Amino acid sequence: MKHGAERFEFYLKKLDDLFTQAGSQSDPAAWLYQNGARTPLFMLEGLARLYSNLQDKKSFEKVEQKAKSLEDALGVIDYYDGFAKQFATDKTLPDGVLTFTQKRVAESTATLNELLKDKEWLGADSKQMRKIRKRLDEVDWLDDKKEVKAIEHYYSDEIKSIDKFAAKYESGFTELESQVHELRRKLRWLSIFPQALQGVVQLTDTPSNDPVLAKYLTPEITGSPFNKMPPAGTNEYTLVLNRDNFYALSWMIAQLGILKDQGLRSDLLGESGHESDADKAAEADVLKQSSAITNTYFKEQSLDHLVNGLRHY
């Protein structure tokens, strides 16, 4: 089996186990959410997203769509459940906000249960998993060198695309979801692919000693397990990223995530009919802070120097 196929099968096996167990639960959606199904789905989606830009676009897009449909549904549950847990201990909120949010948790869980049943995801003989494997069995996988070169080209193209996206908002963000959150999504994929690829991507071994990057190298970032690359293993070729530039990317993703969550809290209060003038002001401040760190980051051109090159073992 080619390395590319092995990477997909790694996550498919995890999902096989989850869907088999979920099939015997009274509330499969809640069980999948509570047992971490979102992570392997996200990794599978990421692999399919990447490979659809490397080869056989149609097959990989189908796999991406299937994984994304479930990952998105779990994401909605996570969104409401996360805030429901926050709101449960916040005595300053207006009456009705917690009840509204808990109701949304129940509704989003019911929606996922319908999807799981209608599309036949559950059980040891999952129809959707069979369809995914059938698609992947038809792929003419690239050899290692061609594959890693294609990944390198994809990173370069994607970085140029992200630069253009960010440049549109040099004068400042005006919208949370389509601007701040979308930028974070684009950046985040660049940090997700290395984990999903299981050793294909490695970081340089030595620090850059670049004073411009020093502010991004916080203990939380440099010590994060998500910033440790899986071992290269049997991969003959790897794509090497500059370590400190990767840390800077990780810092940006983390900070935009913190700001995004602050803005989403205001959005949810508005959805429940309880957004105050102070909440609106807080969202405006989120946009302002997001604009400031984004402009600084892209003016420094750290992302443009993320890719170091190929390594042959």
Predicted segment positions?
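Function-determining surface determinants
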Residues: 1-313
